[in-house]
Amino acid sequence: MTKALYVGSFDPITNGHLDIIKRAAKIFDELTVVVAINTNKSALFTPQERVNLITQVTRDLENVACKSVTGLTAETFTQEKADVLVRGVRNGEDLNFEIQVAGMNQYLNQEVETVFIPANSKWEFTSSSLIKEVVKMGGSIKGLVPETVEVLLKSRLK
Amino acid sequence: MTKALYVGSFDPITNGHLDIIKRAAKIFDELTVVVAINTNKSALFTPQERVNLITQVTRDLENVACKSVTGLTAETFTQEKADVLVRGVRNGEDLNFEIQVAGMNQYLNQEVETVFIPANSKWEFTSSSLIKEVVKMGGSIKGLVPETVEVLLKSRLK
Amino acid sequence: MTKALYVGSFDPITNGHLDIIKRAAKIFDELTVVVAINTNKSALFTPQERVNLITQVTRDLENVACKSVTGLTAETFTQEKADVLVRGVRNGEDLNFEIQVAGMNQYLNQEVETVFIPANSKWEFTSSSLIKEVVKMGGSIKGLVPETVEVLLKSRLK
Amino acid sequence: MTKALYVGSFDPITNGHLDIIKRAAKIFDELTVVVAINTNKSALFTPQERVNLITQVTRDLENVACKSVTGLTAETFTQEKADVLVRGVRNGEDLNFEIQVAGMNQYLNQEVETVFIPANSKWEFTSSSLIKEVVKMGGSIKGLVPETVEVLLKSRLK
Amino acid sequence: MTKALYVGSFDPITNGHLDIIKRAAKIFDELTVVVAINTNKSALFTPQERVNLITQVTRDLENVACKSVTGLTAETFTQEKADVLVRGVRNGEDLNFEIQVAGMNQYLNQEVETVFIPANSKWEFTSSSLIKEVVKMGGSIKGLVPETVEVLLKSRLK
Amino acid sequence: MTKALYVGSFDPITNGHLDIIKRAAKIFDELTVVVAINTNKSALFTPQERVNLITQVTRDLENVACKSVTGLTAETFTQEKADVLVRGVRNGEDLNFEIQVAGMNQYLNQEVETVFIPANSKWEFTSSSLIKEVVKMGGSIKGLVPETVEVLLKSRLK
């Protein structure tokens, strides 16, 4: 029985994130999507809004749960009795950043292992920040985020 | 007849930008340099100042025009009846960022094609931000930007 | 009037190459695909076979011609009265190699300019060498190369 | 129940490989190490020798099996009823190569998913080829490969 | 007689920085660690606090001195009669940034030469910013920074 | 007193190598250029020819010596009583390879330290292999290698 955690800010969830969730849910027996609350960064959606959106768009995935957590991922890993952290990577630059975070997590908690799932090349250009910028400039993000997220983003950034 | 757009913030134009402009003007029949106005970012020079500087330093290049635009590059591409977007790249990191932006532009407007011109290695270390930082610290940027830009930068950052 | 050259070994042409050809043909007024004959490397198909395959799969693209050439690209550039060289790039590693080749070409012939077209992420994992390896191991490459190429490859590598 | 495959040439297995095996065996319920036989490449050890070495150095890992296979990994994936392919990555360059191979594997067999485990920085500089080169030049590789491998390598490359 | 400068913000010094200092002190006859004061950036520790910390943790290294400087590194290089600048690099991304800074320093002062020391892989995941973030979230950074720094960090970020 | 070694195949020396030699000779008190003889690789020039060429083009650099060596660099480091190994790097890819070699050298001999000198962007596109290829195809390499090397290369590759 293998339990994975997918930790991120998901502000908001994009179809790129959703693709990683679906593929991780297929690989691992259990997947918990964790909205990491970072009090040092301003966010567009509250933690609860983000959890609601993720829960809604993953409702068909039986082995996927979602929660929000403050504090260190290395501690959440133990609290959640996880076996592995999952992260998506698009290119060498993502990898350099993720190797640093994975190294720090394993330093803080020797049990923590991280695996990287290569992003589907279809979503290679998506990121929450670029999508929010396009919405602010009046662009259509249809197909880049789940519909419920699209509606909420437009109203929030009108 | 091939029309290219070179879109950026140009805050201000550097000799690295100017090198890309001259080479793109040689490759393509028509080149329009577009100062992209981003209301979410503070700039040192107003859009009009940036357009004036670019117009002045490219006055000898007959097939080069310059304007400032708010809004999405993907829309400007259609409004300007362009055939291609041009961007300069210095290294793998620039490329990762540019591939993401090019992917989003093509998603928003299927007609958009982007080509990358390899930066002349002579200007590999220049960027508007690093040049502004050097001026703030009293360094000489002679030869890194056109003279008119150098004079204006010094007075603005005195 | 802008004439581009797309120089490569094309041993054989893949759908990744064909995607670059179609997009370059859309950007530039004229495109010549040049099969570069490298006497130091063994090839699976003869130069003429490669030219025939390319000519056949680009027959609907009116502004695209194809020929094979021995000798330096920097010299072919002048002989063909080209304005620009076109190359596809998938990631930072491709870029490092291409920047080196572009730098040497411009050193040998100052007129040579090179632009890079970002590979369509759909074809990011294709390359002639990986496709040939898959065929040798009995895998199906349907959809990765034009059909005529698929048939010829299978018979050649049976 | 999650079954992973770790496919490679392992010519021979190094402590870097062994580290990935141990960590994958901890993450997944079952791990099969597959020695991929590539008839196009010359190898130092026979497939059976490589399987024997791997089997011996992983004997304490109950959920780890080892076998050699010719043919496509995408087919082995189905034959072995695997859930995921596992590969180690050290840097951006490894990732670019692995993303290409993972993309081809998923093209050949849609069920194939690949995850990358970041190499332990301790083994970042090891590779079978560099280790063989050091042995050929009389260097000591103590600690870089399991002892049995060290003994066999020295005798084979004397 | 070779004198090196190691210039950075060191806000605060980490064991990764200390590793570079020890190795540079072994390579070069003289090493001056320079705390670069950047009035445009907010810092956690004052320049004097940073100098005190560095002086304390390098007290056993006879050929190492420390000072803080405002102004351009290219000018400090001449004032300090240095022969070379030393910087640590962990991966390709660090290198791209460092090549840009080294290029600008050499443009501002032709005498400036920069050499890069590969970070010890043990400290590959450490950086002042990530360490401060972990402390803010209540994590233990024991072993990542010298003890005196650990104590001061905890009190400062309580 | 700091003694550096610059180890490579130099088959043949290029102006890119020479630039690294001149800059290393300026930084360090003593520099020995070591032609590493690799019996597993075919070379265009004999070790002695390479040493003669290097000796000739560095005759004005008083603190530079040259020799050829078989065997491990880690052992040569001790025999030559060196303080540091010097290597040139052009981009992230070079760095990944050099970090691996530096890691292995330090593993084989804990005393070995390696520093990287950023290649002058002017020579970023040069490499012995690319230069030999251009000569084979009849191209002019004037200015890319010292004149004596140019003459010898042309006659050898006629």
From Swiss-Prot, chains A, B, C, D, E, F:
Gene Ontology cellular component annotations, sorted alphabetically: cytoplasm
Record-annotated site: Transition state stabilizer: H17
Positions of ATP binding: S9, F10, H17, G88, V89, R90, E98, W123, E124, F125, T126, S127, S128, S129
Database matches in Gene3D superfamilies: HUPs
EC numbers, comma separated: 2.7.7.3
GO terms (BP aspect): coenzyme A biosynthetic process
Compartmental location: Cytoplasm
Keywords of the record: ATP-binding, Coenzyme A biosynthesis, Cytoplasm, Magnesium, Nucleotide-binding, Nucleotidyltransferase, Transferase
GO molecular function: ATP binding; pantetheine-phosphate adenylyltransferase activity
Main localization category: cytoplasm
Residues noted as binding substrate in the record, renumbered to the chain: S9, K41, T73, R87
Assembly and binders: Homohexamer.
Family: Belongs to the bacterial CoaD family.
Protein known as: Phosphopantetheine adenylyltransferase
The gene coding this protein: coaD
